[in-house]
């Protein structure tokens, strides 16, 4: 069910409580924390380091200047997706889509009316 976590040696993903992710130099450090067991003072954790992928990105096409940028490792994104499924509860769609659209439309009407009034006031100043 969680092939990437299993690949990291985590055979019981239900024990995962949370995780943290930080960047150190040219590496991303993923730390996974497990639920504290009876009799333990601290929760067990494991740490994994992933090298950042380096890419050259065209900055200015006229002068053909490139800039070296780093981005998160693809394998790490797959692991994080699995961790999010475990640690973050599924979102509840509380807002009715039709109601949200109507609310957004009313807000847009107010914004447009306000902008029209502002432009008309500016026109009056020019007379």
From Swiss-Prot:
Entry superkingdom: Bacteria
Cross-referenced InterPro entries: UPF0325
Protein family (similarity comment): Belongs to the UPF0325 family.
UniProt xrefs under HAMAP family: UPF0325 (MF_01519)
Protein name according to UniProt: UPF0325 protein VV2560
């Amino acid at each position: 069910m969680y092939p990437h976590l299993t690949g990291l040696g985590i055979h019981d993903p239900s024990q995962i409580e949370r995780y943290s992710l930080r960047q150190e130099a040219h590496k991303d450090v993923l730390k996974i924390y497990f639920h504290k067991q009876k009799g333990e003072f601290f929760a067990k954790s494991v740490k994994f380091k992933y090298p950042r992928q380096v890419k050259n990105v065209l900055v200015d096409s006229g002068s053909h200047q490139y800039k070296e940028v780093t981005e998160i490792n693809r394998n790490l994104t797959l692991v994080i997706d699995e961790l999010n499924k475990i640690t973050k509860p599924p979102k509840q769609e509380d807002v009715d889509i039709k109601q949200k659209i109507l609310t957004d439309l009313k807000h847009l009407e107010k914004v447009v009316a306000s902008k029209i009034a502002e432009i008309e006031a500016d026109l009056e100043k020019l007379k």
